[in-house]
Amino acid sequence: MDETSTIWSILESVEDPEVPVLSVIDLGIIREVSLVDGQPVIVLTPTYSGCPAMDMIRIRIRMALLQHGFSNVQIRTVLSPAWTTDWMSEKGKEKLKAFGIAPPLPLQTVCHPGLFHREEAIPCPRCNSYHTTRISEFGSTACKAIYRCEDCGEPFDYFKCH
């Protein structure tokens, strides 16, 4: 395995501090991994420009790579194109559902810009019912909303698409 492949593999173990069931790879925020003069360069895009977890993510990336013998890690942030939930891996979406968080639906399915946008039903991650109600636009983090399933009665987070 070459060094860049090794780095990608190491990044699989770096958890998102706000949704620890996901790695930074699952989340889809790692855009590029390269070596410049033998030193790792990681290019990432935050889930949104004011994401409070970015400093902790950078620290976790550096620590993980340092533990595997990589030093002088450069981490570059790229804001364009902006991250979308479509960049999240299918494995990551499955992990969210297993953890009890409804994964984001594809952008074209649920996120309609404009004045007359219609809210789509979000399936319950526990019983798969679409008979759900949004309780709050904002959950424990800015990227989640709180829903309740009207069939099983359970509240759940929905990872909002953007």
Residue ranges and their predicted role:
Residues 1-162:
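Domain-level signature for proteins that mediate thiol-based redox and metal-cofactor handling
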